[in-house]
Every structure is written in C-alpha cells, then in structure tokens.
Amino acid sequence: MMKFKLVSDYRPLGDQPKAIRSLVNGIKAGMREQTLLGVTGSGKTFTVANVIAEVQKPTLVISHNKTLAAQLYEEFREFFPENAVEYFVSYYDFYQPEAYIPQTDTYIDKEASINDEIDRMRHSATQSLLSRDDVIVVSSVSCIYGIGAPTDYGEFTLHLEVGSGPGREEVLEGLINMQYERNDVEFDRGQFRVRGDTVEINPIHGTPPIRIEFFGDEIDSISTVHRVTGRRIQKLDRVTIFPAKHFVIPEDRLQRAIESIEAELEERLTELRSQNKLLEAQRLEQRTRFDMEMLREMGYCQGIENYSMHLSGRKWGEKPNTLLDYFPEDFLTVIDESHVTVPQIRGMYNGDRARKDTLVEYGFRLPSARENRPLRFDEFQESVNQVIYVSATPGRYELSRSQNIVEQIIRPTGLVDPEVRIRPVKGQVDDLLSEIRRRVERGERVLVTTLTKRMAEDLTDYYSRVGVKVRYLHSEIDTLERVEIIDDLRRGEFDCLVGVNLLREGLDLPEVALVAILDADKEGFLRSETSLIQTIGRAARNVNGEVLIYAGRFTDSVMAAVETTNRRRKLQMEYNRRHGIKPRSTRRTLREEEGPLRNLKVDEIPDHELELIIKDLEAEMRDAARNLEFERAARIRDRIMSLKSN
C-alpha cells in the first residue's frame, strides 16, 4: 500500500498546527462533518494537505469552478509529487444541452466539443482510484454527474502477463468490447493497431503505447514504446488495460436494455395517444426506434446517456453511478469555498430536471431520460463519508451541521486583516480618486468594486480621463484573458482595477493595498455579509492593506462584516505582539514570458522560418494548456496571433 508523503519546504505556522491537530482528531474520532474557517492567506490548502498526510485516506476535493480546481490540482501535485493527484472536471470545451422551447416551437439539439486532454485526465482519475490507495482527486461538481458503474469498468479491464494467455484473438476481442478502435494508420489515444503477431495499444489515460508480442497463444513480451518512432522504452512483466469509455456494457445487458426501452416506449405511446398528443407520439416513436436500431447494430447511439437507466439496470429513482462510487468506503471529502460550492451542488438536480421535463412532455425523450441526472443533494450527502468544509465565510448549512468548527485566523506571514474605514456615499468617487493617487505614488495597486456593470464602465471612463491608469474587469472576459489582465495589474501596467464582482478566483494579489467598496449600504447578494468579508480579504495579502467602505447607512451586513474583521485583526495583532512577529506581505511569483517569445522581431524573420516558429509556439501552447499553465498558454496564444497578423 502506497502512503501519502507530503513534500514541502514549509512547516505549519500560525494557527495551522492547531487546525491540523483539531481536524485530524475529529476524523479519528469519527466526526462526519467539520469546518475549517480560515481567513484569506492563512494557508488553508497547506492545512488540508497536512491533514491528508496524517489520516492517510483517499481524498476528493470539490471546487466550484474549473479554474479554481486547476489551481488546487497544481498545489496538491506540488505537495504530493510521489502520489496520484488527479483532475476530474467536465471535458466539454463547449456544451449546448438538448432542449425544447415550447413558446417558439424551437428544438435545440445537443452540441458539444470535447477536450481530449481533460478526457485523458478523467480516465487517469478513475484508473488510479481502482488501482491504488494514495489518490487525491480534485474535481468540479462534475463528480456528481453520472458515469459508468465502477463494477462494469473494472470487469472490462484487461490484465496481461508475459508467459500466459489470453491469446491474440481474445485480446483483440477484449479491446473491441472495451470500446478501443482499431486504426492501423493513425495511432491516437484509445486506439490499437495490429501487425502480424504484434498488437500495439495506445491507452486511453495517455501513458506511452504498449506493445504486446505473441508466440502462439502466449504473450511473449510486453513493453512500452515511443508513439512515433516505435522505439522500445521499457520492458514489462505485466500490464493492465482499462476501458476506453466510462460507459461499457456487457452484450447480454445491452439486449435486456433494448427490450426495456421498447416496453417503456409502448407504454408512453399509449399514454400520449390517450391524451390526443399525436404529434408528440409520432415524434417520440420515430426518434426512439432509430436509437434502438443504432444500439442493436452499433452498440451506441447519439444521446445514449438518455437511456442510462435501462443500460445500467437501475430502477426508477435509484441513484446514478458517479465518480464518488469509484472511491473506497472510507474516503475523505474536502469541499473548497463551501459557501459557494454547497449551494451549487444543491442546485444541479433541479436545473437539470426542469429541462428534461419539457423534453419528455413534448415527445422528444422517454420519461426515463429524467434518470440521466446529477445526484440529488440528499443522495450526495449519503454518498460521502467524512467531510471538511473549507471557507473564509462558511454558510449556515455547514456551520449548523459541523461537529467541529476550526478557526484559522493567524497567518504564517504575520499579516493582519486590513483596517476597515467607513466613509459617506456622498462624494465617494472624488474621495476615492484622492486615495487611489496616494497608493499609486507608493507603487501599490487598487481594487474597486461597484454594484452595476454600467457604474463600473462610467467610473473607469471618468478615472481614465483624469489620468488614472485603470482597467475594467467584467463577466464576458474569458478565463485566459482574465489571467492576463490580472498579471498586467501586478506588473504595474495599470494601477486600478474596477469590477462588479471581484470575489472570483485569481484575485489574491500581494500588490493590492487598497480595496474600495462603493454603495455598500445597498443590501443584496453583492453586499451581503459573506460577500463583504470576501471582498475585504482581497486586501489581506499586503502589509499596508486597507479597505474603504462607502455607505450612507450602517446595514446589518456592513456592521457584521466590520465586526468580524476587527475581531480577527485584534487577535492577529495580539498574537504578533506576544511572539515578536513583524508582518510581511505574501510573495507570489509572477511568471514572465520566455526570452525568445518576447524578443522576436517579426520583420527580420523569413516567411518559411516564421511558419516553423508559429508551429513550435502552437505546440508549446498546447503543452502549457495540458499542464494547466493557463497564464503561459495565454501569453503564447497572443504571440501566435501577433505573428500571424504580421
């Protein structure tokens, strides 16, 4: 059994040792739910890593979006380089679900673009869970959506060993049943090729291709090879091949599923005709019978997931198989930013159900299509074992259910929560302008959060006209461009960033010394106690951090947020005084572009060389994206676009 081994140059400091000890004791005592209430910059991820290393349990870490999940994945990979740290998020680059709009009689077919690299990582996650114990999977809410049953996935696994069977024909049949494709020309992931008594397999999880050489009905040798040159890399005694798809179905169950679909179809057609819904009945019969024919002939059809209840042999209302079923019973779940992630998990089922109800009502799908769904919240609760909620502002749900609430208020850096000043709304724009100019003179950065997109645009325009280097961040900017804007702020290419909701990922910036919250007296989602505390935390990584709250009256949310911040600040300052700690700003490396990217002079490069450079850069960009280095990938992408335009 492999053990988790934490590798780090740091040791627990501040409140971390106490938090680690308390959480570990809670897990060992059998506590089902605990909360780590850690302020911004207190090293919550490092605390969780230490807990995992102490309790030695396979762990699922759930984040509320792909970008945050990618950041956590990178951090855990650094902490556990010798263990299996995996990434499991939706593999769609683009996804338009099937839908019907009755008001306009508009049917929208499902459209999707699958990211091959993320698909590889999903398979790597499930394979690690079925083959070893030292596994951490960082996931989005994709973990509550249906995938194939682990029993089927494991049953279709092919175990091969030198000096024994199965023979060549059995191996080929097994690969076909596992949804591998034969392709003797190309050799992509999830494909195999045959050359005489030699079979080469390119595994779905992306490890080097495997060459199997047969002598009669025995395996003579197994080795990994280079995909292009075919050169042998390493000889192996044995190897395990996992299925190319998460949905793999035995032939006998497929036939039973088709019969079950037929029975449901007849029942539903009778019901629709009795209600005089003849158009809906005709539509349903035509679509379903076509799908059934495809299943008989090909073993697959478009939208096969809508028949998942029949194909998996589940009963009506029975819980679908998800990533959680691939974990052993005694696993640990960590829900990051739980104040956002828990409501997201809770809401997935209802949103999916509403869309499916319309498709069923108008004859586009059988009623059983509703069973292709994410977990209900109660099913999710039953599926997890022990849970740690992690947040600077945990919600009522987490706090009410936790048997142990652990505060992590003291930061390892000695930084204290920023000083909060409340100022009147009248004249807020000009008052803030003078404060911004003071910070710019000191080489510091400023974040400003407004209530509306229009106000953010107008404020940016006004400050720009009076000489402030200011940019505006809005929801329509994609992830890579967002990373670039934040990097430009850190480099000092501009000094002030204005936005509506600056709580999202990637805004823990050591250079930011002032956060301004305009119109804080307007109660609502963006000015709730939780949102205000999160926004105040954006200034908590700089030793000169300060927050200005502009409010015409003291709302309950403002008072609670200020009171919480002042309480924490007092505790932190007292701790520093007792231990003689001098606070220091956090450090976060800003990745610079590589020299060759920055120094290329397009006019001096011959066309044929320019084409080669662009090809090299495109390969480098794909590598960066594959390694989840989004900042670097974005910079390379922009350089490619610049070269192409010239």
From Swiss-Prot:
The UVR domain covers which part of the protein?
611-646
Which sites bind ATP? G38, V39, T40, G41, S42, G43, K44, T45
Claim: DNA damage is one of the keywords in the record: yes
Q: Which UniProt keywords apply?
A: ATP-binding, Cytoplasm, DNA damage, DNA excision, DNA repair, Excision nuclease, Nucleotide-binding, SOS response
Task: Please state every residue range assigned to the domain named Helicase C-terminal.
Answer: 428-594
Q: GO cellular component terms?
A: cytoplasm; excinuclease repair complex
Q: Which GO terms describe its molecular function?
A: ATP binding; ATP hydrolysis activity; DNA binding; excinuclease ABC activity
**GO BP of this protein:** nucleotide-excision repair; SOS response
Q: Organism's domain of life?
A: Archaea
Give one Pfam family: ResIII
Task: List locations, semicolon-separated.
Answer: Cytoplasm
Q: Where is this motif: Beta-hairpin?
A: 91-114
PANTHER family for the chain: UVRABC SYSTEM PROTEIN B
Please give the NCBIfam families that the UniProt record associates with this protein.
PRK05298.1, uvrb
Record's subunit section:
Forms a heterotetramer with UvrA during the search for lesions. Interacts with UvrC in an incision complex.
Write the protein's name.
Answer: UvrABC system protein B
